[in-house]
Amino acid sequence: MSALKSLGNLLVAVVASALVMALCLAPIAGLGGAAIARTDETMQSNLSDLTHGDVPGVTTITDVNGKPMAWIFKQRRYEVPSEQISQYAKDALVSTEDRRFYVHEGVDMQGFARALVTNVLAGGVEQGASTVNQQYVKNYLWLIDAENEEEALAATEQSIPRKLREMRMASDLDKTLEKDEILTRYLNLVSFGQHSFGIEAAARTYFDTSAAKLNPAQAAMLVGLLQSVEALNPYTNPEGAVRRRNVVLNNMAAQGYIEQSEADRWAGAPLGILDKPKTLPEGCITAGDNGFMCDYALRYLAEKGLDLDTIKNGSYTIKTTLDPNIQQVALNAVRNNVSPHTAGVAQVLDIVEPGADSRNIKAMVSSRFYGLDLDQSQTILPQPVSLVGNGAGSVFKIFTAAAAL
């Protein structure tokens, strides 16, 4: 046994030395292909994106009172500062994904080598090797930086050159950011399943709470999902989610973040998730009768240079001038006059507040419902307004008649 242990230690030392040399030589190792070349370029020279770049969030479109009427996004994420993330979540992450996080400098060569030797001797994957820094780099290049599927595959491909570049970027990251900032950025970035990205969206999705209020069991379940959000989905595999949660709780206890008695107590508790995940509808199509105003606002902003892709990648609040009370009166008026189900007819009405400097749109309605299902009397056309203005129609006849008199 002692000889085997000595052999293992020797192998660890040899592998660690080889990895250090490879890491030093990484800049000259080529991956081939345009997408892989771009990933390499990002890893070498675009550290500012990894350390200061924004991540996609949720843009909210509101009425004049600030009440949300639609949400626009590519990834449902709410970026929150460190102080709004439960310490339990950070402790769960470190104890499970990277126990030497506060000791290493972005790349845990000792842990990497030991995991490699363990896996070789075991004939399979027994230990992971990526640090939190490395996982952050990989996820950022995959979720944020990749512009197409090919680049996403290049950012996550299983190859030694890509891994070495990832390690180098992880090391640079550690020199640039404080440890807590790395944890915060990581927890704001990654996917937790159910179309939730970042710890805040995950907390809302599964527990209808905030990231700041996560208890040890909730934090442990969410961190446990990172191993495989599909296989450990608590709605389709609750037993697996419980087992993984309890592993994380025991890791937290073993690392001294919570007492073992506390871990045991939480391990005996049910998952406590919502009956169904709390999601968020996306797009003007979900705004109901406010959809026409939502659509108009997006088209107006596009004319001003703020395109839909930018809005979907931002975390903006777009406050419209729509007044819900006036909107309801206008809606009742057109639908009392023309039924939404009248074939071939759609009556529209805009109410615009006059003014010298601005003319605020207070209501924008159609007798038909906003939507894409014609069988349900829905339409997105004709729009109540146009960016080139509405025709005055018969309104001007009175002026012609007055002139004739």
Regions found by a protein language model. Name each.
Residues V55-V58, T62-Y257, F369:
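Peptidoglycan glycan-strand catalytic modules in the bacterial/periplasmic cell-wall system
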Residues M1-T60:
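N-terminal type II signal-anchor transmembrane helix
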Residues E149, I273-D289, A356-S358, L374-Q376, ...:
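Surface-exposed intrinsically disordered loops and tails
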Residues E259-K319, Q327-Q328, N332, V338-V345:
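Non-catalytic structural connector segments
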Residues A29-M43, E157, K304-L306, L322-R335:
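Short, positively charged
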Residues R244-L249, A267-L271, V334, D357:
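Short amphipathic alpha-helical coiled-coil/interface segments
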Residues R38-Y78, K276-P281, A287-G288, C294-E303:
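Extracytoplasmic low-complexity, Pro/Thr/Ser/Ala/Gly-rich segments
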Residues K67-Y78, A201, T205, E230-P234, ...:
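Short pre-catalytic segments that frame enzyme active sites
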